[in-house]
Amino acid sequence: MIFNDLIGNNNIGD
């Protein structure tokens, strides 16, 4: 799952 964190960075999780 790809999502934006609260700072606006792109993160990849399971």
Curated annotation (Swiss-Prot):
Top-rank taxon: Bacteria
Further comment: On the 2D-gel the determined pI of this unknown protein is: 5.4, its MW is: 38.2 kDa.
Stated name of the protein: Unknown protein CP 46 from 2D-PAGE
Species of origin: Clostridium pasteurianum
